Amino acid sequence: MHRRFTANDAEEDGTTQTSPDSTAPEGTVFHHANDGRPLATPWQVATERSIALADRPLAEGYIVDPACGSGLQVWAHALTLARPAIGIELDPARALASALNLRTVGEMSGGVGLPWCEGSAVLAGNGLEAEQALTTALGQASPCVAMLQLDPARPRNSRHHDLSEMRPALDGVLDAWRPWFAPHDLGPAMLLDLSPRLSADQRAQVEAMVEERWPSLRRTWVWTSRGRGRVDRLALWTGPLADDGALRRFVRIPPKMGERPFTVATHHPVEPLTITVHPPQRGEHVSLLDAALVESGLVAQWLADVTKDTDLRWGVVDGRRPQLHHPHPLRLRPEDRGLVQATGRVVALFQGSLSDDTVQDVVELAIEHRFSSLKLRLATPPERQPAWQGALDRQLNGRSGEREGFLAQHPNGHTLLLCVDAVSNP
């Protein structure tokens, strides 16, 4: 059985918590259950993804999210696309939070009373019981799903996990909702918001599940990043949601509200990057690039727009700090700068790794090379990073140096690179 909530009848019962979202309009407070806040999609990310769907030719019908959590993504879709939506959540407290958030989104947008808000509902119950859910929400079940949004729960604090650990299971969701899609010439519209840590093999498994049920269905993988060296979202968009012919798309969400995202897409298969480790060299340039851009496979296409260098050498392609070595500075446009964590010219080499014993030696080398600021751009023990960065800041600040820069780790693992920042010191 499912319990039905709407924006009009949801009442706080003490099982939810509230918290502001800095990416939402000022004063907006969203509801979460228990530890739901860290799992919730930021409102800015949710709305930007919904805006990207605005020109997609969906069938008539409802947006359905069978594992909606706090509901921010499905209500962003409903608001932006002006369509009613049905969110389903197994946990009753999260279902209530989602209904309260439906009301919040309606109130902050002036949507209360409009068809998309009045026609939307939250069901507390099993998202795999599709027929029963539609009957509870609408009075009867029929093929009325214009779009399926899915963001299944995954193991937390785990760098790698199997597809079978997602809840609800992806194959179960596809089978449960397969009969209920509204007819469309391009097939079912699905936004499968999966783990950002999916490997290439796991992505192939997901595609095989979709292909088995809907042969030749159009699909596009979309990587989304807000920077900070991480992939925030990885999703498969299918049917009318997929880009026409585009196999992959990368979206960089800007740090400032109101700015438009930066997008790169390709219609062609991508080649894997090859690591080439050369001895460290003074005078060469080092760039730490957006991890999601590199993981998406679209970095070569982007690099063709910002450099004419042909001698590009990848030192690191995985993790939070993909590292590229090149002879000349990148020619960055304003919109490109969000894709670069740091870029600059190597002016000094330090043989060894950063530690409590060597940080003072690094400070002295930085002073010798006229640095006024040197930011750590390498993996460090979390408990030591503040002390090491603090030592650099205290001793370089107020000196006669005029260079701003960063400290990176050469891929050989035993050389530190002191780099003059190319953006601050053009």
Show where each model-derived region lies.
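SAM-dependent transferase fold signal centered on methyltransferase-like domains
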Residues: 1-426
